C-alpha cells in the first residue's frame, strides 16, 4: 500500500487541477447561497463524468498514447475541432485560476499591487518551475499540497457543525431551475465540478509522462474520489457558516480570499489562520501550475498531429497562454466572480462536444483496448444526453 501511495503522480496532478476554483470558490459559494440544495449536483457531476475522466489514464496506459493522438485517429476534422475548443477556452481558464490565486497572495502578503500584476508574477514563476523541473517538480509538490489541503479541509468541515451563526429572516435562497441566475450558477458549478471535461486529455498526457503507468487507474481513483469528498466538504463549510446569514461572498479576488479564510478560522479557531492561508494558497497555486503545464501541452500535441512533425512547441504555447491570460486580466475582466463564471460556463457548453469525441474514440478502439465496460458506455451515453439538454436549456434562457 505504501509503495502505491509513493507512486502516485498523475492522479494527484488531476486532483491539483480539480481542487481549485471548483472547490474553494464554487463549492463554497454553492453552500453559502443555496445551503445543501446543490450537494446532489456534486454527486451527479462525478457520476456522469466518471467514464470520461477515467478514460484519460486508461487510454494512455493501454494504448501508450495521449487522448490527443487518439482523437486524431477520428480524422483531421476532429483534431481541428479539438484545437478550436481548446484555443477558445484556455485563456479564460488560465485567467480565472490565476486571479483567484492572486487574491490569496494579496491577502497573505498584504501587497498593494493589483491582482493582474500579481497574476503576471505568478505566471512567470510557473513558467520557471516548469522550465527547470518539468514533471518531477509538479509530481513532488502535489503530494505535499494535497495532504495539507485534505487534512485542514476535513477538520474545518467537522468543526463547522458547531458554528453558531446568526440567521437573517428571508435570506435563505431556494434554487429554481426556471431562474436564469440559478441556472447560470448551476452550469458554472457543474462545468468545473470536479474539473472541466478537458482534464481527461491532460491526465492522459501526464500519464504518458509519468515513469510508471501500471498504477494509473488506482492513481486516478484516489484523486477522483478525493475531489468528490472535498467538494462536499467545501459546500458544507459554506452552508454551515454563511447560508441564511445575509452575508454575500465578495466578487473581488482579495475580498473573497479574506472571506474564505474567515470561514475556516471561524470553524477551527484563530490559531489555524496561517495553516489555512498556506493550504488555500498552495491549492490554488497547484491549480494555476497544473493548468499552465497541461494546456500548452495539449496545443503542442494538436500541432504535432496536424503538421505530422516530431518538433514540439510546448514552450511557445506556454508563452502565448501566459500573454493571453494576462491580456484578459489587464484589459477585459479583472472581477474574479465574472471571470470564474464566464470560464466555467464556457467549459460546460463545450463539455458535451468533448464527451461525444471520447465516446466515438471508445467505439473505435474499445474492442482492442477494453476501455469501457457496458455499464460505463451506458452511463457515458446518459451523461452526453444530459450535458446537451442542460446546454440547450441554458441557451434558451439567455437567448
Provide a role label for each language-model segment.
Residues 130-160, 344-351, 376-383:
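Membrane-interface loop-to-helix entry segments
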Residues 14, 41-72, 81-93:
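Juxtamembrane transmembrane-helix boundary signature
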Residues 62, 78-110, 119, 284-302, ...:
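Hydrophobic transmembrane alpha-helices that form the core helical bundles
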Residues 27-31, 54-77, 105, 109, ...:
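Flexible loop linkers connecting adjacent transmembrane helices
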Residues 40-55, 217-245:
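Selective recognition of specific alpha-helical transmembrane segments in multi-pass small-molecule
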Residues 147-178, 186-204, 355-367, 390-399:
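Hydrophobic alpha-helical segments and their helix-loop junctions in multi-pass secondary transporters
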Amino acid at each position: 500500500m505504501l509503495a502505491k501511495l509513493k507512486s502516485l503522480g498523475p492522479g494527484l496532478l488531476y486532483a491539483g487541477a480539480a481542487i481549485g476554483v471548483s472547490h474553494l470558490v464554487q463549492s463554497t459559494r454553492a453552500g453559502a447561497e443555496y445551503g445543501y440544495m446543490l450537494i446532489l449536483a456534486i454527486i451527479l457531476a462525478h457520476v456522469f463524468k466518471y467514464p470520461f475522466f477515467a478514460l484519460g489514464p486508461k487510454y494512455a496506459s493501454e494504448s501508450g498514447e495521449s487522448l490527443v493522438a487518439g482523437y486524431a485517429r477520428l480524422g483531421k476534422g476532429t483534431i481541428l475541432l479539438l484545437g478550436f475548443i481548446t484555443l477558445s477556452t484556455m485563456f479564460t481558464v488560465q485567467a480565472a485560476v490565476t486571479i483567484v490565486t492572486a487574491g490569496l497572495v494579496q491577502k497573505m502578503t498584504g501587497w498593494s499591487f493589483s491582482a493582474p500584476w500579481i497574476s503576471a508574477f505568478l505566471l512567470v514563476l510557473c513558467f520557471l518551475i516548469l522550465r527547470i523541473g518539468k514533471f518531477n517538480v509538479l509530481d513532488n509538490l502535489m503530494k505535499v499540497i494535497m495532504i495539507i489541503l485534505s487534512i485542514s479541509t476535513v477538520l474545518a468541515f467537522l468543526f463547522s457543525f458547531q458554528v453558531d451563526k446568526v440567521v437573517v429572516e428571508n435570506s435563505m435562497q431556494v434554487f429554481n431551475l426556471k431562474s436564469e441566475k440559478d441556472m447560470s450558477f448551476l452550469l458554472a458549478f457543474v462545468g468545473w465540478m470536479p474539473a472541466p471535461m478537458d482534464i481527461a486529455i491532460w491526465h492522459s498526457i501526464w500519464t504518458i509522462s509519468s515513469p510508471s503507468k501500471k498504477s494509473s487507474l488506482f492513481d486516478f481513483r484516489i484523486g477522483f474520489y478525493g475531489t468528490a469528498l472535498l467538494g462536499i466538504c467545501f459546500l458544507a463549510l459554506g452552508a454551515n457558516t454563511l447560508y441564511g446569514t445575509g452575508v454575500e461572498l465578495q466578487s473581488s479576488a482579495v475580498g473573497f480570499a479574506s472571506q474564505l479564510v474567515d470561514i475556516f478560522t471561524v470553524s477551527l479557531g484563530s490559531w489555524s489562520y496561517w495553516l489555512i492561508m498556506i493550504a488555500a494558497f498552495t491549492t490554488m497555486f497547484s491549480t494555476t501550475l497544473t493548468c499552465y503545464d497541461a494546456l500548452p501541452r495539449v496545443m503542442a500535441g494538436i500541432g504535432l498531429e496536424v503538421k505530422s512533425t516530431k518538433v514540439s512547441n510546448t514552450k511557445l504555447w506556454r508563452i502565448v497562454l501566459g500573454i493571453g491570460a494576462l491580456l484578459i486580466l489587464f484589459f477585459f475582466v479583472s472581477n474574479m466572480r465574472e471571470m470564474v463564471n464566464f470560464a466555467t460556463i464556457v467549459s460546460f457548453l463545450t463539455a458535451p462536444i468533448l464527451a461525444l469525441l471520447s465516446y466515438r474514440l471508445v467505439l473505435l478502439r474499445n474492442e482492442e483496448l477494453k476501455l469501457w465496460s457496458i455499464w460505463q458506455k451506458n452511463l457515458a451515453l446518459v451523461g452526453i444526453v444530459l450535458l446537451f439538454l442542460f446546454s440547450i436549456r441554458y441557451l434558451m434562457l439567455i437567448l
